[in-house]
């Protein structure tokens, strides 16, 4: 079955919301599964091929063609296979050097650290920037049940173990902090230092439960993302925009539905709204690259 063009972008963008929501849009209308070799040769705008792990998890993989000639991004990815799904990362600097592990948030990917990676590598560190499941060049399960907060935690812990990383200098941002801080707390002996940028510790106020699901996303009007209403590089995004910082679970439910279903949603819109310096169009396109 082929996706109607009106829904194609929603489908491939769905995992961008998964990191923050612990869920992804249920996708059932992709073409039949194909071999990984066929996937690797796809054009960037080709219809996704669904592949299946040995455990029966259906997933898609962003074609390599989507990541060519990105500005300030000369890095080739490495991969660790965890439960049949590829976890992508870049690994720069001396292999035996002190480790800096960089964790991005939502809806970005390791491209977020394009300015930091060369500086840290030139300073003599081994720099590892990982893409969370459903983000960047990592595999993207199509079932909403394949994403969870604890699942991201467990994958990160396995990733660290597979690479045999110790004495880690951890830098976390946004949802990378919620994932990374909990993981570091579970195995503190593996971590030497921790730095947090635009992040928070994991936890819920007393009495808070699971965010209620949106009952009918199809009737949700195209939620106006608050950041899009603010001129770029404006401090008031943090100081005066109460809706985006609203703690009402219902608002977060609306954000979930918007990020997973709205055709107007693009990662670059969110990143641009929260970036002090103006982003050139080529860099905005690079943030969107994983979700053509």
Set out the residue ranges of the language-model regions.
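A fold-wide structural signal in alpha/beta-hydrolase
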Residues: 121-131
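Hydrophobic alpha-helical packing residues
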Residues: 101, 120-121
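Structural cue for short, hydrophobic secondary-structure segments
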Residues: 102-105, 129
């Amino acid at each position: 079955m082929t996706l109607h063009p009106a829904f194609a972008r929603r489908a491939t963008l769905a995992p961008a919301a998964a990191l923050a929501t612990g869920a992804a849009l249920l996708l059932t209308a992709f073409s039949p599964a194909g071999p990984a070799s066929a996937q690797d040769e796809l054009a960037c705008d080709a219809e996704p091929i669904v592949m299946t792990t040995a455990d029966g998890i259906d997933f898609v993989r962003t074609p390599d063609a989507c990541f060519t000639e990105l500005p300030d991004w000369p890095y080739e990815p490495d991969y660790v296979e965890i439960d049949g799904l590829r976890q992508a990362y870049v690994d720069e600097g001396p292999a035996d050097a002190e480790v800096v592990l960089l964790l991005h948030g939502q809806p970005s990917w390791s491209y977020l650290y394009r300015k930091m990676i060369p500086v840290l590598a030139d300073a003599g560190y081994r720099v590892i920037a990982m893409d969370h499941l459903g983000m960047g060049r990592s595999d993207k399960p199509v079932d909403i049940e394949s994403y969870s907060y604890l699942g991201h935690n467990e994958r990160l812990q396995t990733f660290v173990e597979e690479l045999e990383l110790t004495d880690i200098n951890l830098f976390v941002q946004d949802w990378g902090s919620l994932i990374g801080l909990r993981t570091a707390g579970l195995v503190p002996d593996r971590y030497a230092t921790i730095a947090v940028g635009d992040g928070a510790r994991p936890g819920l106020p007393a009495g808070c439960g699971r965010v209620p699901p949106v009952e009918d996303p199809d009737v949700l009007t195209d939620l106006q993302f608050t950041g899009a209403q603010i001129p770029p590089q404006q401090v008031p995004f943090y100081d005066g925009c109460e809706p985006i910082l609203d703690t009402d679970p219902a608002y977060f439910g609306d954000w979930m539905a918007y990020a997973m279903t709205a055709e107007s949603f693009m990662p670059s819109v969110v990143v641009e709204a929260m970036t002090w310096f103006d982003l050139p169009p080529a860099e905005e396109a690079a943030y969107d690259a994983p979700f053509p």
